[in-house]
Amino acid sequence: MSNILSIQSAVAYGHVGNSAAVFPLQRIGHEVWPVYTVNFSNHTGYGHWTGPMIPASDVADIIKGMDERGALERVDAVLSGYQGGDDIADVIVDAVAQVKAKNPNAIYACDPVMGNAKSGCHVSDNIPPLLRDKVVPAADLITPNQFELGYLTERDVTDLDSTLAAVD
């Protein structure tokens, strides 16, 4: 069993972010500690949603509280997804650094959520460059979709050959 710090969104309607990650990871035996970046009515890809972005200072305070309980040294993996505000990037990168300082074997898996090929970008304009320039370089593993891979690599990803070229 691994301990996973999952820093992602929560939605009431639908299954994305922590609303999609926590239960399946628990079902396969992992302990998951969710920290929310937003608490939205639904996925932003619908075009309209309600609910708050969680301030970066609140996210940092939650992680600090976990550290004060000795939890960060027990983290085996950090998982991040939908950022919400652009100030969350610093909190995530800092949390990863704290975890890795306490457990050098811990890994960081980043889902660089930006959008998709069908509906385009559904995050604020500040998020994609932050993901590309700050968050993704801190990751051991990234899980971009086709749209996100194209943005991150500045390539046109349209088929298997172009996908393989982009990840090479």
Task: Indicate where each model-derived feature is located.
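Conserved N-terminal subdomain of the carbohydrate kinase-like
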Residues: 1-117
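Short, solvent-exposed loop/turn segments at secondary-structure boundaries
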Residues: 16, 46-48, 119-124, 153-157
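Conserved phosphate/ATP/ADP-binding segment of small-molecule kinases
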Residues: 123-168
